[in-house]
Curated annotation (Swiss-Prot):
Residues spanning the signal sequence: none
Protein's name according to its UniProt entry: Protein ApaG
Biological processes annotated in GO: error-free translesion synthesis
Gene3D superfamilies xref list: ApaG domain
Native species: Sinorhizobium fredii (strain NBRC 101917 / NGR234)
HAMAP family: ApaG
Matching InterPro entries: ApaG_domain, ApaG_sf, Uncharacterised_ApaG
Domain ApaG: 3-127
Gene name tied to this protein: apaG
């Protein structure tokens, strides 16, 4: 599990390999990830946009951005938690993702909340140190 805390907004990520959707013989590797966003602050915030920086093991970078998450722009009141799941396909057996959410506070202030970097590793992947 991976965690980041920005201005009392906690983001927790739990990635998992989706073997049934992956096809290594066709260079298709798919991961799901579960995200929990917890508002530990004293003000309400709305998740407005997302930004992802995805890098595969060959260094190929894909950047993804857009409004909300899974079609929603959730409002998190103080003490609220919001959970969602999504996925990421890669052409390589491993990679890494990180990013941020743009949040809008109830007073109109906007700020970014970090999504922690997390690894996408296929089961049985052997790593060697040089």
């Amino acid at each position: 599990m991976y965690r980041a805390l920005t201005r009392d907004i906690e983001v927790t990520v739990e990635p998992y390999y989706l073997e049934e959707q992956s096809d290594p013989d066709d260079s298709r590797y798919v991961w799901g990830y579960r995200i929990v966003i917890s508002n530990h602050s004293e003000i309400a915030v709305r998740l407005m946009t997302r930004y992802w920086h995805i890098t595969d093991e060959n260094g190929q970078v894909d950047e993804v951005s857009g409004p909300g998450v899974i079609g929603e722009q959730p409002l998190l009141n103080p003490g609220d938690t919001y959970e969602y799941s999504s996925g990421c396909p890669l052409d390589t057996p491993s990679g890494v993702m990180f990013g941020h959410y743009s949040m809008e506070a109830e007073d109109g202030e906007t700020f970014n909340v970090a999504i922690p970097a997390f690894s996408l590793d296929s089961p049985g992947l052997v790593r060697t140190l040089n």
